């Protein structure tokens, strides 16, 4: 019978039946693959990576807010279908299914792992475990970068983007000084109003100002109001650089996920304009700095010596000369990496600092210890005739503060899942506790998701994992000389010894290049604030509720962020009774 003559109802029913059969056949195929691996597995109707999962997530999340805030996690029937479910689950699912297991649907397989040794192995085999293109393409709104490239392209990018973060480049000194300056501006602003403030807004302002200066050499006053950002538009532009930066960083998620042509047709038109204008500004800056360097290879910005833009262009020119080419990075590649610096240097750092400030407001005992250390470092500087701190002389002195920072990184990692995939059948090694290593073969196209939260909250690697203990980063090594170099071992050295057990900055062959840049900004800003003030909860904030919600809920941004409602206050240390 001619299909075109079938009744509509019969046609729809037949089509639906064929679709279901097609899905069942695919599911049976992938279940067979899962069985062949020898790993435990569970079957779900929809994976978090599928379009339907991404569509359902914003609709379903609000329905379970109360349950999630109590630390109950997701119901079993829905958890693997929710995008970024791992934060709310912590280790719960791995306690049920094991440290390494598969999730199977009709669209494929995902291998989730909370095995630190396996994770370390995966992160070091970067040519076998690749980044899924669909997950990382969104990080290229302006061009390819060191986070999205693979193989030879990655090697090329890292040769140019790594040198700007070395201590000798001046970038870490620059970010230390600018973070301290912006923190002082923050304190002045808070002290003048003498009230509780929107913490997330102020921390975001601070980190935006820091990355604008250290990234592009452009000064942004912390106290600049949003209304003022609209002024001073140069000829040929539709908005000021600062306004474009403000909009792009504020609406980063929309810019990464929504096509520009859709934004232009909706109420998000101004965001689309900011996206385009920021690109225009950055291209102009690239061309100006390139021209300056072509005249003088040792050129440095008079104000922002060591800024990332100039450093990347210089490294690119050096790479080109070494390879006998006219240029190394294209303009798009420079632009792509500048955007990555903006994303990491603004959003990731802002969220990490926000979690730190909230934690100190909740834990005055920790704040006491950090203040004691801050005062001690300032006293040492004064004995040397210095009135201020700097990166070179003082960064490594903040042992307890460093430990606190890393505990915040552990408990509230910016990225909850590190995503990989295998392009061909690949052997993995699983390391069960108290058992011999076991090998399993993952089929081609299987995704491998390193569950950062499940590792960071794993008692096998972190005794009493829910407790924030800065001392765990120090122990006896903080005061023990290194026998080979006679150099004092600092807490930072221990962070390099926990292979695979701390993945805030990823790890292995593709560890974050800017981790020390972030650490410098974090400690500088915190030390500057705590030199004069204490951080306390704002009026009306319930400490128990705040703690419960920062541990179990998130704002749903590009990286992990707390809910926006938390209010804090700065109080002069002399005005706050402790003990």
Curated annotation (Swiss-Prot):
Keyword tags: Glycoprotein, Heme, Iron, Membrane, Metal-binding, Monooxygenase, Oxidoreductase, Transmembrane, Transmembrane helix
Membrane topology field: Single-pass membrane protein
Matches recorded under InterPro entries: Cyt_P450, Cyt_P450_CS, Cyt_P450_E_grp-I, Cyt_P450_sf, Cytochrome_P450_monoxygenase
Record flagged with keyword Acetylation: no
SUPFAM superfamilies: Cytochrome P450
GO terms assigned for molecular function: heme binding; iron ion binding; monooxygenase activity; oxidoreductase activity, acting on paired donors, with incorporation or reduction of molecular oxygen
GO process terms (BP): mycotoxin biosynthetic process
Listed pathway(s): Sesquiterpene biosynthesis
Entry cofactors: heme
Residue runs in coiled coils: none
Sites where the protein binds heme: 512
TM helices/strands, residue ranges: 6-25
Induction: Expression and the subsequent production of PR-toxin take place under static culture conditions (oxygen limited), whereas no expression of the PR-toxin genes occurs under the strongly aerated conditions required for optimal penicillin production. There is a negative control of the transcription of the PR-toxin genes by the penicillin biosynthesis gene product(s), or by a regulatory peptide encoded by a small ORF inside the penicillin gene cluster.
Function: Cytochrome P450 monooxygenase; part of the gene cluster that mediates the biosynthesis of PR-toxin, a bicyclic sesquiterpene belonging to the eremophilane class and acting as a mycotoxin. The first step of the pathway is catalyzed by the aristolochene synthase which performs the cyclization of trans,trans-farnesyl diphosphate (FPP) to the bicyclic sesquiterpene aristolochene. Following the formation of aristolochene, the non-oxygenated aristolochene is converted to the trioxygenated intermediate eremofortin B, via 7-epi-neopetasone.
PANTHER family noted in UniProt: CYTOCHROME P450, CYTOCHROME P450 12A4, MITOCHONDRIAL-RELATED
Protein name from the UniProt record: Cytochrome P450 monooxygenase prx9
Native source species: Penicillium rubens (strain ATCC 28089 / DSM 1075 / NRRL 1951 / Wisconsin 54-1255) (Penicillium chrysogenum)
Origin organism lineage: Eukaryota, Fungi, Dikarya, Ascomycota, Pezizomycotina
């Amino acid at each position: 019978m001619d299909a075109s003559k079938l009744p509509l109802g019969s046609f729809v029913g037949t089509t639906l039946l064929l679709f279901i059969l097609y899905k069942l056949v695919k599911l049976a195929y992938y279940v067979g693959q899962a069985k062949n691996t020898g790993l435990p597995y569970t079957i779900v109707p929809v994976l978090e990576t599928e379009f339907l999962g991404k569509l359902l997530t914003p609709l379903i999340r609000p329905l379970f807010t109360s349950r999630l805030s109590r630390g109950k996690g997701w119901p079993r029937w829905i958890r693997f279908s929710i995008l970024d479910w791992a934060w709310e689950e912590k280790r719960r699912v791995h306690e049920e299914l094991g440290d390494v297991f598969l999730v199977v649907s009709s669209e494929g397989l995902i291998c989730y792992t909370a095995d630190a040794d396996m994770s370390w192995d995966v992160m070091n085999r970067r040519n076998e475990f690749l980044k899924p293109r669909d997950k990382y393409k969104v990080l290229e709104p302006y061009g390819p970068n060191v986070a999205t490239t693979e193989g030879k392209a990655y090697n090329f990018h890292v040769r140019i983007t790594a040198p700007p973060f070395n201590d000798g480049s001046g970038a870490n000194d620059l970010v230390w000084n600018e973070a301290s300056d912006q923190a002082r501006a923050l304190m002045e602003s808070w002290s003048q109003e003498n009230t509780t403030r929107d913490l997330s807004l102020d921390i975001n302002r601070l980190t935006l100002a820091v990355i604008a200066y250290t990234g592009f050499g452009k000064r942004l006053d912390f106290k600049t109001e949003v209304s003022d950002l609209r002024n001073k538009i140069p000829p040929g532009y539709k908005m000021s650089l600062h306004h474009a930066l403000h909009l792009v960083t504020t609406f980063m998620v929309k810019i990464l996920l929504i096509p520009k042509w859709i934004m232009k047709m909706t109420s998000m038109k101004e965001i689309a304009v900011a996206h385009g204008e920021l690109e225009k500004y950055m291209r102009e800056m690239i061309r100006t700095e390139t021209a300056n360097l072509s005249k003088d290879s040792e050129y440095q910005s008079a104000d922002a010596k060591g800024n990332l833009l100039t450093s990347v262009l210089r490294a690119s020119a050096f790479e080109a000369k070494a390879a006998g080419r006219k240029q190394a990075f294209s303009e798009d590649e420079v632009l792509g990496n500048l955007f990555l610096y903006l994303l990491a240097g603004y959003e990731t750092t802002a969220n990490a600092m926000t979690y730190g400030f909230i934690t100190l407001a909740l834990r005055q005992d920790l704040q006491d210890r950090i203040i004691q250390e801050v005062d001690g470092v300032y006293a040492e500087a004064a004995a040397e005739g210095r009135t201020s701190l700097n990166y070179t002389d003082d960064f490594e002195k903040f042992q307890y503060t460093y430990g606190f920072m890393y505990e915040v990184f552990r408990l509230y990692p910016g990225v909850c899942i590190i995503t990989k995939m295998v392009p061909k059948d690949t052997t993995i090694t699983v390391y069960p506790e108290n058992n011999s290593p076991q090998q399993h073969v993952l089929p081609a196209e299987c995704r491998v998701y390193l569950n950062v939260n499940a590792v960071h909250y794993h008692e096998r690697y972190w005794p009493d994992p829910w407790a924030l203990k800065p001392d765990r980063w120090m122990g006896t090594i903080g005061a023990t000389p290194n026998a080979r170099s006679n150099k004092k071992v600092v807490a930072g050295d221990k962070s390099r010894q926990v292979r695979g057990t701390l993945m805030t900055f990823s790890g292995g062959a593709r560890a974050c290049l800017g981790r020390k840049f972030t650490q410098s900004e974090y400690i500088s800003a915190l030390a500057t604030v705590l030199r004069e003030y204490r951080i306390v909860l704002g009026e009306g904030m319930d400490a128990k509720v705040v703690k419960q919600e920062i541990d179990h809920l998130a704002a749903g941004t590009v990286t992990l962020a707390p809910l926006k409602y938390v209010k804090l206050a700065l109080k002069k240390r002399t005005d706050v009774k402790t003990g």
